[in-house]
């Protein structure tokens, strides 16, 4: 049996998640509503928008799951992440690039999150790679562009045409 801990998944089919949907989803919708994307200002050791996450595209999560399906002899608990952290600025710039315009605005870091917020997360993907996964991961800029295109075309859902 395999249990995977999926880290910061983004991509099509997440509309139902509401406030828990990915940053890309929220940035895209912020741009539609306000023609700008808002990120947290500097906090602690991290500059404005420089907080990071190990963002993984939903297509890559599917590839990892198929890898385990194809290898029933493998068992254990695995992190399903890329092993590389990217900044929120990276995602925001990808969304703004998609639209060809817009503003990146930094908002004060919320008092309620101070001392509780993780400014850096990154998966340890070494166990996944040691198990033999070699399917790679989609470049974050490419994935953000693809996801924004799906949001444009279908509102965020894959269809036979998308």
What does each of the following model-derived ranges do?
Residues 1-4:
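Short, small-residue-biased leader/transition segments that mark boundaries at the very start
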Residues 8-9, 55:
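PG/GG-rich flexible active-site loop of Rossmann-like NAD(P)H-dependent oxidoreductases
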Residues 9-11, 61:
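Conserved sequence/active-site signature of Rossmann-fold short-chain dehydrogenase/reductase
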Residues 12-15, 127:
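Short beta-loop-alpha junction of Rossmann-like oxidoreductase domains
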Residues 14-19, 116-119:
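Short, solvent-exposed loop/turn segments at secondary-structure boundaries
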Residues 31-162:
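C-terminal substrate-binding subdomain of Rossmann-fold SDR/epimerase-dehydratase oxidoreductases
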């Amino acid at each position: 049996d395999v249990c995977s801990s999926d880290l910061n998944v983004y991509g099509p089919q997440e509309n139902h998640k509401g406030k828990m949907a990915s940053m890309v989803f929220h940035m895209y919708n912020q741009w539609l509503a306000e023609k700008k994307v808002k990120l947290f200002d500097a906090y602690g050791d991290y500059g404005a928008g420089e907080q990071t996450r190990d963002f993984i595209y939903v297509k890559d999560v599917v590839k990892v799951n198929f890898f385990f399906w194809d290898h029933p002899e493998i068992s254990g608990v695995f992190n399903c992440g890329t092993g590389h952290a990217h900044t929120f600025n990276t995602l925001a710039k990808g969304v703004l690039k998609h639209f060809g315009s817009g503003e990146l605005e930094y908002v004060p870091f919320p008092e309620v999150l101070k001392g509780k917020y993780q400014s850096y997360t990154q998966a340890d993907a070494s166990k996944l790679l040691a198990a033999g996964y070699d399917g790679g991961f989609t470049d974050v800029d490419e994935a953000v562009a693809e996801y924004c295109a799906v949001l444009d075309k279908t509102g965020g859902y894959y269809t036979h045409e998308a």
